[in-house]
Amino acid sequence: MVDYSKWKNIEISDDEDETHPNIDTPSLFRWRHQARVERMAESEKEKEELKKKRQSYQARLINVKELISKKEGDEVALKKELEKIENEGKELDRQENELLKREKKTPWNVDTISKPGFEKTVINKKPPRKAAEDLTEEEREQRMKQFVKENEKLCKQYGMLRKYDDSKRFLQEHLDLVCEETANYLVIWSINLEMEEKHDLMAHVAHQCICMQYILELAKQLDVDPRACVSSFFSKIQQCVPEYRQQFESEIEGFKERIQKRAQEKLQEAMAQLEEEEKQERMGPGGLDPADVFESLPEELKACFESRDIELLQKTIATMPVDQAKYHMKRCVDSGLWVPNAADVQLGNDETEAKDDETTTATNETPTEKENSKSQNEKSADAAKEEPLYAGVSTDDVD
């Protein structure tokens, strides 16, 4: 059986006490509280006085005992003083015991029923997420390359999943994928698929990319690690209200439009780069594009180059004003459409090869053969002087 008697001496509240109608209840409660406070103050004062007496008693007792031990002064008087002090100590013990008994009998009240164990308030806060590292562009690129090298296969597996439950389970098994690098990889993969005209596959990967971006955005809003938001996101997207679902689908459509636009831009950039490379390959010695130069020529000069008729070219240039002829022929030379003195260059190359052959076989020839060879070479040179080969048209020829 439970003993409730100890609760009878608790004086906590007067709110439920019945009072006479003619008595002002708030005033009565106030007087009672004031009397209680005064009793507590008197008790505290009495304890302080006993504490001071105890300190004085201890000091006097030690002092007298030291004098007796050192045999200083009247020993009889000191012993009487010691006896007197010891009697005072007994009286102090009696008074302290009485005070302790009174305190035990004093009913508890709102001021004495409890006291603070400590005056410190501690509020547990979630540890702040680590701030994004301040990386340079090169460091970010290197970090992305390392991530792709280590996780490309897993990223593609995630990108090919279709059901939300499968995606949730896969990410929970590979929490390292829940990061910004995975979203960036899926964006790049979507662009490449669109450039390859794999539109359906691009749309599927785009859906998975938006899921990852929503997880990262949810983590930012809650200020927690993204890995802690995987389950929350998939539960929310599967049980969401129609408005949230509509917003999610709208985000996917907008993302696919941006992917298509970016893929088209990259294709145009690639085509422009290819054309520029081809143009650089076509560039002549003077840095001009032969196709552009040909299109800028007058029709009569175009006809000469198309027919490859040198005589017609000479006649056409002869009929043109000198400054125009110089201008067009210089552009033809700079673009490589026309190589001046090409025949002389070819002739010089042939003669060099012939001399090399003669040098190689010179040791095997007899003096008669050398003379015959020399005679033939001189005749060939004389013939070349009498009938010069056409070496092409240059700006000097125009003058």
UniProtKB/Swiss-Prot annotation:
Keywords assigned by UniProt? Chaperone, Cytoplasm
Name the segments for region: Disordered: 1-26, 345-399
Q: Which InterPro entries match?
A: Cdc37, Cdc37_C, Cdc37_Hsp90-bd, Cdc37_Hsp90-bd_sf, Cdc37_N_dom
Chief location of this protein?
Answer: cytoplasm
- Listed SUPFAM superfamilies: Hsp90 co-chaperone CDC37
Could you provide one GO biological process annotation from this protein's UniProt record? protein folding
Q: Where in the cell is it found?
A: Cytoplasm
GO MF entries: heat shock protein binding; insulin receptor binding; protein kinase binding; protein-folding chaperone binding; unfolded protein binding
Q: Which Pfam families match?
A: CDC37_C, CDC37_M, CDC37_N
Q: Which GO terms describe its cellular component?
A: cytoplasm
Is Chaperone there in the keyword field?
Answer: yes
- Transmembrane domains' residue ranges: none
* Basic and acidic residues bias: start-end ranges: 1-11, 367-388
Question: Its family?
Answer: Belongs to the CDC37 family.
Q: How does it assemble?
A: Forms a complex with Hsp90. Interacts with a number of kinases such as CDC2 and Sevenless.
Function noted in UniProt: Co-chaperone that binds to numerous kinases and promotes their interaction with the Hsp90 complex, resulting in stabilization and promotion of their activity.
- UniProt protein name: Hsp90 co-chaperone Cdc37
- Could you tell me which species this protein originates from? Drosophila virilis
